[in-house]
């Protein structure tokens, strides 16, 4: 038996159906407040209703910018990204700047950069200018600041 895929046309949901859509979206993925508002605006009749609904969901902790920031941060750290790349990813989610700074300040970026350097290039401190430049470019691309990069590539493992 073939089922017809029924799709609600855009810009006609309100009330309970809009709330159901919001819950359906949030069960699949964590959205920032602004992302959820933009997504729901596509289907809603009234923009003010969307804003009110998202504020209510946030107050009831169904939606949390804090959780979104933590998830993005842990994901980016697993990928070996530095503070600048992570800040950019968090800004793309349109999160509050204070929240972004709170999330980023507790991390030992020197240790992160050093571990990434060791994983890619080993523990040896390079004296060759070309190889040193390659390490610097690698860590810069990952989003680390130059002072941290220089400390990481000159660091000698103390055992």
Curated annotation (Swiss-Prot):
Pfam families reported for this sequence: RecX_HTH2, RecX_HTH3
Source superkingdom: Bacteria
Ranges that cross the membrane: none
Protein name: Regulatory protein RecX
Organism: Acinetobacter baylyi (strain ATCC 33305 / BD413 / ADP1)
Main location: cytoplasm
Alphabetic keyword roster: Cytoplasm
Cellular compartment(s): Cytoplasm
UniProt record similarity statement: Belongs to the RecX family.
GO cellular component, one term: cytoplasm
Function recorded in the entry: Modulates RecA activity.
Biological-process GO terms, alphabetical: regulation of DNA repair
Cited InterPro entries: RecX_HTH_2nd, RecX_HTH_3rd, Regulatory_RecX, WH-like_DNA-bd_sf
């Amino acid at each position: 038996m073939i089922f017809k895929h029924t799709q609600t046309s855009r810009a006609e949901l309100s009330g309970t159906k809009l709330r159901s859509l919001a819950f359906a979206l949030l069960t699949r993925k964590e959205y920032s407040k602004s992302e959820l508002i933009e997504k729901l605006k596509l289907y809603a009749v009234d923009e003010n209703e969307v804003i009110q609904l998202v504020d209510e969901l946030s107050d009831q902790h169904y939606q949390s910018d804090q959780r979104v920031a933590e998830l993005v941060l842990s994901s980016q750290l697993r990928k070996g990204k530095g503070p600048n790349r992570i800040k950019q990813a968090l800004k793309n989610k349109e999160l509050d700047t204070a929240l972004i700074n709170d999330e980023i300040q507790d991390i030992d970026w020197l240790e992160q950069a050093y571990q990434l350097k060791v994983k890619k290039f080993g523990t040896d401190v390079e004296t060759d200018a070309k190889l040193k430049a390659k390490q610097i470019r690698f860590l810069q691309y990952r989003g680390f600041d130059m002072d941290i990069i220089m400390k990481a590539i000159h660091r000698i493992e103390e055992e």
